[in-house]
From Swiss-Prot:
Its main location: membrane. Gene3D superfamilies: ATP synthase delta/epsilon subunit, C-terminal domain (1.20.5.440), F0F1 ATP synthase delta/epsilon subunit, N-terminal (2.60.15.10). This is ATP synthase epsilon chain. It is a peripheral membrane protein. It comes from the Bacteria. The gene is atpC. PANTHER family: ATP SYNTHASE DELTA/EPSILON CHAIN, ATP SYNTHASE EPSILON CHAIN, CHLOROPLASTIC. It comes from Polynucleobacter asymbioticus (strain DSM 18221 / CIP 109841 / QLW-P1DMWA-1). It is found in: Cell membrane.
Length: 138
């Protein structure tokens, strides 16, 4: 099977750079699966898990907190707002963040920002889903 070049980068660092057989990630309108020869595409990505099936058959998981995806027939570039390797995700922090967001949505104060609380909740839920996926593949 032919491979495609994959680069996952955040503002802080390069998270993954290498050859892959397949890449799956959460696009703005749904889950995307990318193989070599894919039609060129630029789209926003939602918070969630990027699954990279590497050329050697191993899988790599990266959590992204949104960003942009560029696909060329021989290259995939993920420009993430924040990117964290699957094994570096902190479940306790994600659970606490989700709990804080839920409490904020229930206890609306005068300076309450519903959009911010919903965004934080979605981010924490996406991190927990990514952690669950990463654990299943171990």
């Amino acid at each position: 099977m032919s491979t495609i070049r994959v680069d996952v980068v955040s503002a802080e660092q390069s998270i993954f750079s290498g050859e892959a057989k397949f890449v799956a990630l959460p696009g703005e309108s749904g889950e995307l699966g990318i193989l070599r020869g894919h039609t060129p595409l630029i789209t926003r990505i939602r918070p969630g898990s990027v699954r990279i099936e590497k050329a050697d058959g191993d899988e790599e998981f990266v959590f992204v907190a949104g960003g942009y995806l560029e696909v060329q027939p021989d290259r995939v570039t993920v420009l993430a707002d924040t990117a964290i390797r699957g094994h570096d995700l902190d479940e306790a922090k994600a659970i606490e963040a989700k709990k804080r967001a839920e409490e904020a949505m229930q206890n609306r104060g005068t300076d309450f920002d519903m959009a911010l609380a919903q965004s934080e909740f979605a981010m924490a839920a996406a991190q927990l889903a990514a952690i669950a996926r990463f654990r299943r593949k171990k």
